[in-house]
Regions:
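A generic "folded-domain core" signal
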Residues: 13-157
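Sec-dependent signal peptide recognition
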Residues: 1-2
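N-terminal signal peptide c-region/cleavage motif recognized by signal peptidases
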Residues: 8-10
Length: 157
């Protein structure tokens, strides 16, 4: 996986069109992503996770994390991030962003199938350098990823 730039916004501050929900994930269309589709949920600790497809040009995978809790992260800050998917590790570069009380970041990956392939995995661990680790349990997400793919396929028509 080649990771490109990271930056995130609060779900409440973004314009989404609800597409559906599966396995605790909301699936939505985001017009300014091509339109692209993403699936999102909030962990018990308040961390919000988004994964999907950016279709603004050549299709890319998209992952975003953001939180309301104070973080040592400022808009425009560059930092490294490590993704661990069931023991396979990938590195990327992140750019911080702050919107309406949320701080976070997103990453674009050159292979959109990387996002869909997460359905076959058990856990995604995201570790931004200098920030706390975020665990994403992927067990049982296959239905959500199938709905995400159906959403994205519908946008291409």
């Amino acid at each position: 996986m080649t990771a490109a730039v990271l930056g995130a916004t609060a779900a409440s501050a973004q314009n989404f069109e609800q597409y559906g929900s599966e396995a605790g994930w909301n699936i939505a269309i985001k017009e300014d992503m091509g339109p692209g589709c993403l699936m999102m949920k909030t962990n018990e600790d308040g961390t919000q996770i988004q994964m999907g497809i950016d279709a603004t040009g050549e299709l890319k995978g998209y992952m975003a994390l953001y939180m309301k809790t104070p973080a040592n992260l400022a808009k425009g800050d560059d930092f490294e991030v490590l993704f661990d998917v069931d023991g396979d590790q990938f590195e990327g570069e992140a750019i911080g962003q702050e919107i309406e009380g949320y701080k976070g970041a997103y990453v674009l990956v050159n292979n959109p199938d990387f996002i869909y392939d997460l359905a076959k995995k058990k856990q995604l661990t995201i570790t931004p350098k200098g920030h706390r680790q975020v665990l994403v349990n992927l067990d049982g997400t296959n239905a959500a990823f199938e709905t995400l793919r159906a959403c994205q396929d519908a946008q291409a028509q």
